[in-house]
Structures are given as C-alpha cells and as structure tokens.
Amino acid sequence: MTLYLDGETLTIEDIKSFLQQQSKVEIIDDALERVKKSRAVVERIIENEETVYGITTGFGLFSDVRIDPTQYNELQVNLIRSHACGLGEPFSKEVALVMMILRLNTLLKGHSGATLELVRQLQFFINERIIPIIPQQGSLGASGDLAPLSHLALALIGEGKVLHRGEEKDSDDVLRELNRQPLNLQAKEGLALINGTQAMTAQGVISYIEAEDLGYQSEWIAALTHQSLNGIIDAYRHDVHAVRNFQEQINVAARMRDWLEGSTLTTRQAEIRVQDAYTLRCIPQIHGASFQVFNYVKQQLEFEMNAANDNPLIFEEVNETFVISGGNFHGQPIAFALDHLKLGVSELANVSERRLERLVNPQLNGDLPAFLSPEPGLQSGAMIMQYAAASLVSENKTLAHPASVDSITSSANQEDHVSMGTTAARHGYQIIENTRRVLAIECVIALQATELKGVEGLSPKTRRKYDEFRSIVPSITHDRQFHRDIEAVAQYLKQSIYQTTACH
C-alpha cells in the first residue's frame, strides 16, 4: 500500500494501515504546487526586506530583533540546535514515524513556506525508515512541541541521532551511507518544522489506535469472566439498550451477545439470581461510554492531523498574499482530547480489576476455589495477581489527573499560557500500558476459571479465544512466576494491533 498525502484527508485508519503494511509515502501534485506557491511568498518577503516574524526577525521575546539578511539561514539552524532540549526516554519508533508523517502533511497545506527540498527530505526519512530519536520530555504544548520537533529537525540536517535498520546511529552517517545530503535549512524552515503539535498528536494517534483495540479486546475477556460466573445474559438484550439511545452502548451490547451466543454457562434472569453485579450487568454502559470518548478523541485528532498549526501562516488569495502571526500551534484542543482518552481507558481497567476480583474472591465467585488455587493454603494461586491489578488501576487514577488544567508561563511571559498536551499524551500512553496489563491479568484468571467451570460450555467464539490464549498461558496446576504469564499475554495483545485489524 502507498499512503498518498495531500494535507487535507489523512485519517487514523490511513496511519494504522501504513504501520501494519510497512507502506511508502507519496505526495500528490496539487500539494506540491501549494508548497511552491507558499515558498514563493517567503522569497518575496526576503527580497523586499519586509519585517515578518520568524523569517526576518528573532523568536519569542526576540521577535522585535531584526536579523541581518546574510544570517537568515543561520537563524533557522540556531533555532533547531537551541530548542533541542528534550529529555528522558525517547518516543517509540511508531510515534516518531507518525510524527514525521504528520509534520509533512501539515507542510503540504501550503501555509508554512517550506521548500520542496524540506518536503522531500521528510518523505525520504519516512520511506527509508530513518527514525529520529526524540526524547519525550521537554514540551509545554505551546508554542507547539518545540523540543521534540527540534530533535526531529536535527536528524534532517544531519546532526541528530536516529534508528536505522535496528541500529542507533548518527544521522549524518546514515545519510552518507544512503548517498543523501543533509538538509540545508532556508529562511523560515526551522520554524516551519518545530511550530506545531505533532508530538502530542502522533502519540495521541498511537494511543487512540491501541485504546480502541483494548476496548474490543476487553469484551471477549469480559465474556470469559461472564461465563465463569454464570452471568445473566438478559441484561444485554437489544431493547434494554435501544431505549437509552447511546449508540456505542448499543454496539457493545450487540457484541457481547455475539461473544456469548451458544454458551451453556450463561444464565437467565432469576434462574440462579435475579440480577448480576454492575461489573457484569453494566458492561455495555461502561465500555460503551469509553467508546463514546474514543470517538470524540478520534475526531479531534483527525482535525489536527490535517491542520495548519505553524506560525506565522502564509495565505494567498486573488491578487493578494499576506502573512499572519497566530496561535494555531497551541495544543489545547488535543490536550483536552487526550485527557478524555485517559479517562476512557482508565475505566476499562477499573471495571476489569473489579471483574477479576469476583473471580478470585471466594465470597463472590460461586463454586470456584479461593483465588483459583489448585491447593488452597499450600498454594496461593491468583491471590497476588489481583494485588498487581489493583496497583495498576490505582496508578492510573493518579495519571488520569488532567494535564490540561495546568499551565506555566515561559519565554519571559510572552508565552503565558500553555496546554501541557504532550504531558497528557505521555501519561495517557502509560495508562494504556497499565490497562493492557490489567486486562492480561483478567485474561489469565478467566482462562483458569473457565477451565474449572468446564470449557465445553463456552460459546464457540470464546472457546476459540480460550484455545488461542491457552497456547500462551498453560493451565495453573501449581504456583509459578505469574508475572511471566501476564507479560506474555500483554505482549501478545499489543503485537496483534499492528499485524491485523482490531478484534471486533
């Protein structure tokens, strides 16, 4: 598959397919024409010696400092070097790759004044999978993601560190190996590379893809738990959910009915008990609400993926061109969205932990042994797996605190309100990793519980999942190091995202 970029129509599904299929990027001709026209405006500004922020002036507090024309290019290189103050662990390879795609896509809108050489350099890095090593910490989320994007830009000019073919190398060495010249930044181009929200948005895209997948994965795991506890299927009837009108709640209920169809372990209302606890009965309401959040997040991300979030922006109308200093780099819309994503994913973990507690608690699990222990007393069984899940969901509650309500002034109070969107993105991804492990714990415990109940009673669809995951996690016949089982399941769940489509 080839991913065609035009600056206007990029979707998360495009990104997901690109990552799954190891695709190449191509640029449509109309987008290249827009790039040429916006660059021509920059050249006229330089020729006419106009005063325009970031082209003929300094940056931030130095916006009133006029730069000597002989130093315009040096100004851009200095910008990249001085702003590359990222710290901490690097973003994942996937996030860094998506970051480049998103920055390229915004340049193709034709409002940034980039040269074709810059556009082609980004395309080359993407297609050759030269992945800049970009530290995660250091962005305030306005003026965009300055520090992370500066590390991306360093790689393009041959000064940064990159991953290429599995090895960490100097960018300059990789370019030399591939007979490619480092990019020679022209006027405005440093600013065009780093003024934007691509770090938070790229991490947000990856987080959305994985969060949506966790939502689907959580349903079949919940279906195993439901059967292990002889759950009541009546609560998933379509008419119950249709009268509330929340479409994602209706969708989850339909998928739960599908997962449970043909099971002899489920029960009907008043057959064993009149109603189940909320963690079983309200799966459509709880999980559906998370999917509603995911839909909102997807919409916001896709707006930003196709937005011009540079500063200043170049506009060309009939018989008129103009350059405007604005604030489209401010990450507040994405910060809000990613804070919401944290809540949606955290609740998948919260309800999963409560379900798995019902599987191991002898006061709640019916006729199952305490902690599913093969020999209660001598062997502890799943006792501490629940502790681990409780620890992760409690950590999520701290991480879910909204980053977007924080702000701090910078650049001598010129930049006096910031979004902290990249912090929201980073914390959100940690919540996703934690939640994946909580679901892995529920999976390990539910596999054992269904085995004790009798797998022959499982629905056909959940029986296939049981067999698939039993090849990863063997039966619990004695106490062992269960962290290996948990991590194996979590890793398997994660790997499947970029190999196949999400489980529906």
Swiss-Prot record:
Pathway: Amino-acid degradation; L-histidine degradation into L-glutamate; N-formimidoyl-L-glutamate from L-histidine: step 1/3. Contains an active site 4-methylidene-imidazol-5-one (MIO), which is formed autocatalytically by cyclization and dehydration of residues Ala-Ser-Gly. One of its GO terms (cellular component) is cytoplasm. Keywords: Cytoplasm, Histidine metabolism, Lyase. Gene3D superfamilies: Fumarase/aspartase (Central domain), Fumarase/aspartase (N-terminal domain). InterPro entries: Aromatic_Lyase, Fumarase/histidase_N, HutH, L-Aspartase-like, Phe/His_NH3-lyase_AS. It catalyses: L-histidine = trans-urocanate + NH4(+). One of its GO terms (molecular function) is histidine ammonia-lyase activity. There is a cross-link at A142-G144 (5-imidazolinone (Ala-Gly)). It is found in: Cytoplasm. It is an enzyme of class 4 (lyase). One of its GO terms (biological process) is L-histidine catabolic process to glutamate and formamide. Its main location: cytoplasm. HAMAP family: His_ammonia_lyase (MF_00229). Belongs to the PAL/histidase family. This is Histidine ammonia-lyase.
